[in-house]
């Protein structure tokens, strides 16, 4: 797939900017806070409908404007596709494909596949479990768009169940009736238990399936980057039961669901006391080890960077294998975080195989020959022009 054209209107610090991409490699050159990362963010939004930098749509809109629009022309094997995303400070966002508004956002996902790599991705190793869960979920949405609906269902059930647990906790603390007897609340909780186990087991199974595909690819890349000096492993740590991973490997959805219900029973008193759900994939984690040692606690900075680079290259490879087209690669000021060896490994892996958009403040980290067939654009205060014009 190839991104041919991008049009940003009132998005972040871009008032009305069009960009034509002329080759497989494009460098966005400029000082910090000029809009380089904003452009990559717009491409990420077209891919996943999510931004890792903002939660509210109004934070993505220029100044005090009411709306912003991102449009793109994309070339895929099946033909050319025009994408459009309209964000509003008040009201719902809308998406369109080839000029036709799409009511189901699910149908918009995965039309444009991207892998985003920034310095923040180092948190994949050293950050908390929520960072790794978000990484898995974002990748899964690109590979299986229906997963967005599965995850939404689980989160809706989780919110409802937490609200009920909070009521039960308040009732116990008050030690008085509140219009509903404890038995009625308990009966209602049992209904939410069943829904939580059903939706949660689907999330667990898909995450584990993803890791089974991703782990060997990441291991190969890690071996290549480290010179076969280290052994890298990754494992999905489900909190349902200790041996739940074996059930998942056996692809036993019902087995995982039953294990889920059993764990809920075991933690029932703790949940009612705390007033929140402590069982489920929202508490799961991914464990990375190097030579059987946890990378998060004991990995050096160099080892952690090698690990993340291997994961990102594995993402590229997996998406290409599943989608049967190479995804776009977005490199957001990440080369400055890598030493010369890792920079060369990354740039060599990219070559002209993946269309790549790179942000940087200087060109010193690029080989002169690598730059020969690279489009270089200058970014300054939300305005983009050819570097040759400066």
UniProtKB/Swiss-Prot annotation:
GO annotations of cellular component type: cytoplasm
PROSITE patterns in alphabetical order: RECF_1 (PS00617), RECF_2 (PS00618)
Gene3D superfamilies, alphabetized: P-loop containing nucleotide triphosphate hydrolases, RecF/RecN/SMC, N-terminal domain
HAMAP family (UniProt xref): RecF
GO MF annotations, alphabetized: ATP binding; single-stranded DNA binding
GO biological process: DNA replication; DNA synthesis involved in DNA repair; double-strand break repair; SOS response
Function: The RecF protein is involved in DNA metabolism; it is required for DNA replication and normal SOS inducibility. RecF binds preferentially to single-stranded, linear DNA. It also seems to bind ATP.
SUPFAM superfamilies in the cross-refs: P-loop containing nucleoside triphosphate hydrolases
Location within or outside the cell: Cytoplasm
InterPro entries in the record: DNA-binding_RecF, DNA-binding_RecF_CS, P-loop_NTPase, RecF/RecN/SMC_N, RecF_2
Recorded family membership: Belongs to the RecF family.
Name of the protein in its database record: DNA replication and repair protein RecF
Keywords, sorted A to Z: ATP-binding, Cytoplasm, DNA damage, DNA repair, DNA replication, DNA-binding, Nucleotide-binding, SOS response
Keyword Cytoplasm in annotation: yes
Residues given in the record as ATP binding sites: 30-37
PANTHER family xrefs: DNA REPLICATION AND REPAIR PROTEIN RECF (PTHR32182:SF0)
Sequence intervals crossing the membrane: none
């Amino acid at each position: 797939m190839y991104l041919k054209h991008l049009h940003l209107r009132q998005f972040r610090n871009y008032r009305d900017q069009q960009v034509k991409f002329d080759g497989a490699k494009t460098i966005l050159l400029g000082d910090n806070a000029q809009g380089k990362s904003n452009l990559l963010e717009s491409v990420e939004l077209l891919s996943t409908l999510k931004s890792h930098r903002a939660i509210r749509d109004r934070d993505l809109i220029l100044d005090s404007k009411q709306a912003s629009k991102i449009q793109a022309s994309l070339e895929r094997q099946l033909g050319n596709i025009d994408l459009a995303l309209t964000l509003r400070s008040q009201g719902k966002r809308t998406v369109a494909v080839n000029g036709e508004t799409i009511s189901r956002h699910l149908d918009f996902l995965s039309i444009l596949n991207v892998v985003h790599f920034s310095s923040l991705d180092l948190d994949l190793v050293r950050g908390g479990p929520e960072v790794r869960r978000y990484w898995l979920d974002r990748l899964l949405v690109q590979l299986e768009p229906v997963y967005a609906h599965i995850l939404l269902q689980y989160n809706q059930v989780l919110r409802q169940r937490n609200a009920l647990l909070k009521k039960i906790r308040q009732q116990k603390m008050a030690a008085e009736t509140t219009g509903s007897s404890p038995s009625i609340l308990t009966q209602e909780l049992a209904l939410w238990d069943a829904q939580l186990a059903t939706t949660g087991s689907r999330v667990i199974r898909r995450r584990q399936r993803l890791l089974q595909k991703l782990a060997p690819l990441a291991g190969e890349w890690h071996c290549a980057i480290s010179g076969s000096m280290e052994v890298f492993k990754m494992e999905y740590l489900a909190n349902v039961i200790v041996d739940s991973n074996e059930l998942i490997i056996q692809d036993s959805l019902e087995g995982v669901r039953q294990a889920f219900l059993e764990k809920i029973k075991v933690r029932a008193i703790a949940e009612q006391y705390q007033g929140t759900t402590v069982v489920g994939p929202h508490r799961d984690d991914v464990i990375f080890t190097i030579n059987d040692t946890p990378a998060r606690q004991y990995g050096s900075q160099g080892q952690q960077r090698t690990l993340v680079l291997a994961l990102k290259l594995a993402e590229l490879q997996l998406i290409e294998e599943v989608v049967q087209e190479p995804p776009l690669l977005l490199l957001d000021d990440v080369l400055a975080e890598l030493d010369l060896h890792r920079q060369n490994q990354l740039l060599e892996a990219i070559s002209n195989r993946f269309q790549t958009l790179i942000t940087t403040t200087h060109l010193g980290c690029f080989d002169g020959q690598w730059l020969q067939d690279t489009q270089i654009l200058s970014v300054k205060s939300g305005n983009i022009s050819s570097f040759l014009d400066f």
